[in-house]
Amino acid sequence: MGINSWIAHRTMRNHKCGIFLLNGEQWRSDRLVLNKEVISPVGTRKFLPFLNTVAEDFVDFLHRQVRKNTRRSLTVDLYRDLFRFTLEASSYALYGERLGLLEETPKPDSQKFIDAVETMLQTTLPLLFLPPGVMRWMNNKLWQDHMDAWDIIFSHADKCIQNIYQEFCLGKPRKYSGIMAELLLQEEMPLDSIKANITEFTAGGVDTTAIPLLFTLFELARNPHVQTAIREEIKGAESQGSRELSKVLNGLPLLKGAIKETLRLYPVGITVQRYPTRDVVLQNYYVPAGTLCQVGLYSLGRSPEVFSDPERYDPQRWLSKDDNSFKALAFGFGSRQCIGRRLAESEMMLFLMHILRNFKIDTVSKADLKTVYGFILMPEKPPLLTFRPID
C-alpha cells in the first residue's frame, strides 16, 4: 500500500519505510521477522498480559467517571476515550512503556505524543490524493503539521529504543518488555527498519481498533439479549479457573463472533485490494498480472446471497459448522493478512470482556448509525452510550 505523504516524510527525513509502505522482497524480508513476534500464537501470548492490564485500567477509569455522577451511571460519547485506550494498549505492547493516557492528567510528553498521532491521522486524509511535491512547494500548513507530527512519533520511538538499551546494559534478569525489545534482541532486522515498522504499527492500530470497538458497544447496547449471552459466556470461561489469558479468550467464541459480526457490518476498510504477481484464470475470467483486484467488503457483508438476514446483528452465525473462512475478510487472509490482526483482535476481546463483566450498556437511540468513509469507515455521529455498573 502506498500513502504518498507518509512515503514523502520517510524520504525527506531519510527514514526507512515499514511493511505498510513496502512491496516485493523488502516487504517479505521484514514481514517474516515481524510474524514471529506480532502474529504467531507464541508471540501473541507474550503481549496479552500487557493489553489485559490496560483493559483493566480502562474499567477503573470508567468507574471513576461513573462515581462523579449522582445517577450511578454514565452517558457518554466514548470515541475519544477509546482512542486513548487503543493508543495506550498498543503502545504498551509495542514499546513496553505506559503512556498514562488513562490518568486524570497525562504527562506532558504523553499528551504531546497522543496529539501528534491525532494530527498525523487527521492530516493524512486531506493529503491522500495530493502529490506531496505540491504540498512541499507551497509549504502548506497542513503539510507542515503532518511532517511535524511524524517527527514527534519517530522521536518517541528513538526515546523508547534508548530506554530499552539502557535496560539491556544494566544486566537485569531478562523478562518480556514488548515487541520492539524482542526485535532488538533478535538482531534479525536493522535498527532503522525496526523503528519504521513500530511507528507504522502505532499509526495503523489506533482508529482501526477504536472505531470497531465503538460499533460493537453500540450493537451490544441495542441488542441486550446478545449482550447478556456474551456476559454469561464470560462468566463460564472464567469459572474454569484458568489464569492463562489465551485459554480464557479461546473459551469466548461468541465474543469473537460479535467482533466478526461488527466487522461484517462495519468493515474498517470497505475493500480488500490485491495486485496478482502472475496471470490468473479465476472462474473462467482471465486476470493479467498487475491488475487491481478488489473485494467489496461492505457490500459482501450485507449481501443476502452470502448472509441470511444480513441486516441483523447475530454473532451466533459465526458459530455454525458452515465454512465461514472467506466470509470474514476484514483482516485479509494468507501471507498478506493484516500484520496487526492478533494485536487488534486481542485488544478488542480483552476490552469487551472486562467491560461486559463490569457494566451493562444501553444506548440513547437504537436507530441505525449513519456512516461516512474517510480514511476508514466510521459513524457520521458517534452514538451516546450509557454504562451502568454491575453490582
Report residues per predicted region:
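Cytochrome P450 substrate-recognition site 1
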Residues: 1-50, 54, 78, 82-91, ...
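Conserved cytochrome P450 K-helix E-x-x-R motif and the immediately C-terminal K′/meander segment
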Residues: 155, 159, 244-283, 304
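Conserved cytochrome P450 catalytic core segment spanning the I/J/K helices
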Residues: 39, 43, 122-123, 145-213, ...
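Cytochrome P450
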Residues: 42-53, 64-92, 101-110, 134-156, ...
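Cytochrome P450 heme-binding "Cys pocket" and the immediately downstream C-terminal segment
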Residues: 224-226, 341-378, 382
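Cytochrome P450 heme-thiolate "Cys pocket" and heme-binding signature region
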Residues: 283, 319-348, 371-374
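Central I-helix of cytochrome P450 enzymes
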Residues: 86, 90, 149, 153-157, ...
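Conserved cytochrome P450 K-helix/beta-meander segment immediately N-terminal to the heme-binding cysteine loop
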Residues: 295-321
